[in-house]
């Protein structure tokens, strides 16, 4: 059985590098009819926070990477939170001590004063001493493993000193816990970032000392910023929370992240179908550059072309994570999305572009007021529009278009002035979705209501007699 895992530490929000790792693990499990496990590695007690754990779980749910087992999906290999597995780790620490493959190291004022397997009572629970457990490294070993991405990797233990596996606070270190967890959870493939290669020899030493069978390893290439240094906040925002709040589509994010290290043979695709083609052999060894512009373009393409039902779902979910309130009928919102999405790149832009559809009252742009509302012909155009729209019996796009052309043909002012006057009166601004579509979306009664409101507002202005 193929079993892979994504094991974030809850010391911050999920970031693009972590999500790429989770995605490739998800791809591999999905393709091979395996299991994808989410494990929380929270043994860094000072930095780990429950709020970050909750955020990671929520962000995984938001992007759509379902896992089979985890802290909120118990399975037979739990617990799935490392802080709940301390007794398990202690058992294996004791085993290594008993077999003299590890030993106690006692320091006082940073000076080693005792090392051995039989810890004297005077060192126990005495704050004057710092007691850790170290793993004993035999310096004449050659460590070699086959990496599914990079081929054979070799290490010489002469470059590895004895290393701590249990801290003085009684909490085991990462390189120890990850071995115990991966073995007991029957992880078959460890797919993780290239930055973990240096940890692998220490982990293999622990595997061998405990007579555990090794999993297969695959180390993914680093993600770099445009200056070719490891991607970090100094290059720009990297948290999934940020991209969610900015209105990026989950499907677009996963589409783009798929391209960072894997040759997918196309630029735009649905990740829920692409897993069938995933192959670790096609994962590059070379680092990938995170290109914010390309991510935005990818999002734009998905926003324009994905099924309206999916975009609508993403739009309403986006609103829940912001202060935006959208409680309109689904059919109404879908019409707005359809009319707007070709002109924006994100859901946030979509809302800003179309937000006056969602409210009954709004402020008019200053440019609209100065260029149109203050003109002497404004009142004539609006009154004619109210009258003509009221006369339409069958309210459809063709009839609305013909009606507006009839108003323009009255020669009250130029055609552009007529259309922009109506547009601004309906939506308060001069750049909106198509005018005919906007009138249909708002409906006859709401359109007339808004035109009357604009007329009332214009009566409070000083008229500019210049044409």
UniProtKB/Swiss-Prot annotation:
- Membership in a protein family: Belongs to the class-I aminoacyl-tRNA synthetase family. Glutamate--tRNA ligase type 1 subfamily.
Q: What is this protein called?
A: Glutamate--tRNA ligase 1
**One Gene Ontology term, aspect cellular component:** cytosol
- Cellular compartments annotated: Cytoplasm
Q: What does this protein do?
A: Catalyzes the attachment of glutamate to tRNA(Glu) in a two-step reaction: glutamate is first activated by ATP to form Glu-AMP and then transferred to the acceptor end of tRNA(Glu).
Q: How does it assemble?
A: Monomer.
Enzyme Commission code = 6.1.1.17
Query: Which species does this protein come from?
Result: Petrotoga mobilis (strain DSM 10674 / SJ95)
Tell me a Gene Ontology molecular-function term this record carries.
ATP binding
Q: Which PANTHER family match?
A: GLUTAMATE--TRNA LIGASE, GLUTAMATE--TRNA LIGASE, MITOCHONDRIAL-RELATED
